[in-house]
């Protein structure tokens, strides 16, 4: 009798459990795709405006291979559709620019910055001379597919160039974060005439070829891989782990004193290869006389325009040249 009673009780419990699961499934699929999408939009609308100090955006332009490394941007969102951007590339990190943002529906929920913002759209403007030059620019995105979101982190993917962009809720005012990140970045960028890295990777000899200031080709033996990084308030952060010859490192730190990228275990130590007699970009600014051909010359002025960090120039003809400062 007891056995029969136990069996009946167990059967009833299992039936209730299955009924509960069924109701949950039915509740979910009772909603149309449009309704589920609207739920996602509402979720992200609430998340975006929640952090007191806004978000730090780990922004990687440079197309699918993140050729130009990453940059710290901060952005705060308002309930009435404004996004306020600041950038580590600004001479004064207190500078901010506001523009509209929108949450839209595509293959999923998307975050779009369609109205021009001088700070943010610098990375996606094809008409600037930086990066790949006019017509390409820095190959950055301004429309993103929202992949996941919590109160502390939002992960999204650029719609055109496919880089993963992460946003973390700031725990301090945006200007404080950017000030620290900028100081760390400048301690690296101030070093002139960098051509690469040399040392060890995971305990074995390795060297890296300079692509851009924050992107390298790392070679060890016959194998090679690329890696890109950015500067945060605490140091450097890789876009993705570096994997080479079966070894993998998740983090790479910039050692300002050693002028090297290292890991805590000491197994990776990649020191900068640079010309100590080289000139920094700020030392090249000024007015020059440009001599070419046998007896031709033209006045040239080298200037730094707002935000630009990459300098490219070309002539439309081959010639022997000489620059003389005036």
PLM regions: where:
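Bacterial N-terminal signal peptides that target proteins for export
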Residues: 1-9
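C-terminal motif of bacterial Sec signal peptides marking the signal peptidase cleavage site
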Residues: 16-20
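Acidic/polar, low-complexity intrinsically disordered N-terminal segments immediately downstream
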Residues: 22-110, 149, 161-163, 172-194, ...
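Hydrophilic extracytoplasmic domains
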Residues: 27-49, 249-326
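N-terminal glycine/threonine-rich, aromatic-flanked beta-hairpin/loop signature
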Residues: 64-108, 199-238, 296-326
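General beta-strand recognition
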Residues: 84, 110-112, 155, 217, ...
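Extended alpha-helical scaffolding regions
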Residues: 96, 155-226
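Beta-sheet ligand-binding and adhesion/scaffold domains
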Residues: 114-190, 236-283, 292-294, 326
């Amino acid at each position: 009798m007891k056995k029969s009673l136990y069996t009946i009780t167990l059967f009833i419990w299992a039936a209730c459990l299955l009924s509960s699961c069924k109701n949950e499934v039915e509740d979910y699929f009772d909603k149309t795709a449009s309704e589920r999408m609207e739920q996602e939009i509402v979720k992200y609308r609430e998340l975006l405006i929640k952090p007191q100090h806004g978000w730090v955006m780990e922004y990687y332009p440079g197309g699918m291979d993140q050729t130009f490394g990453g940059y710290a941007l901060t952005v705060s969102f308002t309930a009435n559709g404004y996004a306020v951007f600041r950038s580590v590339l600004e001479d004064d990190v207190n500078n901010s620019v506001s523009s509209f943002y929108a949450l839209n529906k595509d293959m999923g929920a998307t975050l779009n910055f369609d109205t021009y913002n001088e700070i943010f759209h610098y990375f996606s403007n094809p008409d600037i001379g930086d990066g790949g030059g006019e017509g390409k620019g820095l190959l950055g995105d301004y429309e993103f597919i929202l992949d996941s979101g919590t109160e502390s982190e939002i992960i999204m993917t650029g719609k055109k160039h496919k880089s993963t962009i992460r946003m973390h809720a700031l725990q301090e005012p945006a200007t404080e974060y950017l000030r620290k990140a900028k100081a760390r970045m400048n301690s690296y960028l101030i070093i002139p005439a960098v051509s690469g890295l040399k040392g060890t990777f995971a305990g074995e000899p390795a060297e890296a070829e300079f692509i851009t200031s924050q992107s390298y080709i790392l070679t060890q033996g016959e194998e090679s891989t690329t890696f890109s990084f950015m500067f945060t308030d605490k140091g450097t952060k890789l876009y993705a782990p570096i994997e080479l010859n079966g070894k993998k490192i998740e983090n790479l730190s910039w050692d300002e004193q050693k002028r090297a990228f290292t890991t805590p275990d000491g197994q990776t130590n990649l020191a900068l290869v640079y010309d100590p007699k080289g000139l920094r970009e700020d030392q090249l600014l000024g007015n020059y006389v440009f001599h070419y051909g046998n007896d031709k010359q033209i006045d040239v002025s080298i200037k730094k325009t707002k935000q630009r960090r990459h300098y490219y120039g070309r002539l439309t003809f081959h010639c022997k040249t000489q620059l003389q400062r005036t």
